[in-house]
């Protein structure tokens, strides 16, 4: 049985209300909801939370019921203790969270947009729950297995955190916790191609969450899962294809667009 607690208006996104939704699996997810119409879920990446969508959510809410969850381990959602196999933060587990969230909100089918980590959750979501997803968009990602398989010096240098965060506990946790603001600032500045794209207000919100040791550990577990159990799950589903219409977006100056054939790699994973 899921439960829902109203948490007031969003201080970052006009017209959106905050809710804490306790899912059937016991996890509590913080979510911002606004607008009306067909349901559209926006899944954020690392190191952000749902507020990363603050500039586009109000416009999308003119035609959709827009649902902005904090992924498990991120923002103000629960950060459960992980397991040795990292299954707690596998994309399969995180995708199940989203389906349970939509069940709790009363939506049987929905579209979603996933950026970065959210896109990887979305990939598994589209594979495991094809009857629930009407269409989907991935922003700035190639398939996880492809990116690992084609890793070279350029990718490893630009995406250093992929290899730092997967180191055994407590190495990355200890180093990040020593100065979360420094790590977060360097991480974000290394990704930005447009100066000022992340405002000071947004940075402060991300830092508020990043200063929580439980979130630091959860983020590391998210990446550890990506390098282990997620690859195992993908290998077991090599013949599976995304059945719903898939839209791909990426930045022309970004690493993914420069290093990978984005459309070509996803054509191998999707039917549409």
Protein language model features and the residues they cover:
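Flexible "cap/lid" subdomain of the alpha/beta-hydrolase fold that forms the substrate-access gate
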Residues: 2-20, 25-29, 36-39, 52, ...
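Active-site glycine-rich loops that stabilize anionic/oxyanionic intermediates
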Residues: 37, 45-48
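Structural cue for short, hydrophobic secondary-structure segments
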Residues: 42-45, 68
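Short amphipathic alpha-helix adjacent to the substrate-entry channel of hydrolases
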Residues: 51-68
């Amino acid at each position: 049985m899921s439960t829902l607690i109203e948490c007031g208006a969003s201080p970052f996104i006009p017209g959106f209300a905050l809710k804490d939704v306790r899912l059937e699996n016991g996890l509590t997810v913080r979510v911002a909801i606004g607008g009306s119409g067909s349901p559209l879920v926006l899944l954020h990446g690392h190191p952000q939370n749902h507020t990363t969508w603050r500039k586009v959510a109000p416009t999308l809410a003119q035609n959709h019921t827009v649902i902005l969850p904090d992924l498990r381990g991120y923002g103000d959602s629960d950060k459960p203790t992980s397991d040795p196999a990292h299954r707690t933060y596998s994309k399969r587990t995180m995708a199940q969270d989203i389906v349970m969230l939509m069940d709790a909100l009363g939506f049987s089918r929905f579209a979603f947009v996933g950026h970065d980590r959210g896109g990887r959750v979305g990939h598994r979501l589209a594979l495991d729950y094809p009857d629930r997803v009407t269409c989907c968009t991935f922003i700035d990602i190639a398939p996880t297995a492809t990116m690992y398989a084609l890793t070279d010096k350029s990718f490893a240098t630009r995406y250093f955190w992929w290899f730092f965060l997967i180191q055994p506990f407590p190495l990355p946790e200890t180093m990040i916790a020593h100065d979360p603001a420094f790590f977060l600032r360097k991480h974000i500045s290394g990704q930005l191609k447009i100066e000022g794209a992340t405002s000071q207000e947004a940075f402060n919100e991300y830092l508020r969450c990043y200063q929580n040791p439980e979130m630091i550990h959860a983020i590391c577990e998210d990446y550890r899962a990506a390098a282990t159990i997620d690859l195992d799950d993908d290998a077991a589903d090599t013949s599976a294809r995304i059945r719903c219409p898939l839209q791909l977006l990426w930045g022309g100056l970004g690493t993914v667009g420069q290093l990978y054939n984005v459309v070509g790699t996803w054509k191998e994973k999707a039917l549409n």
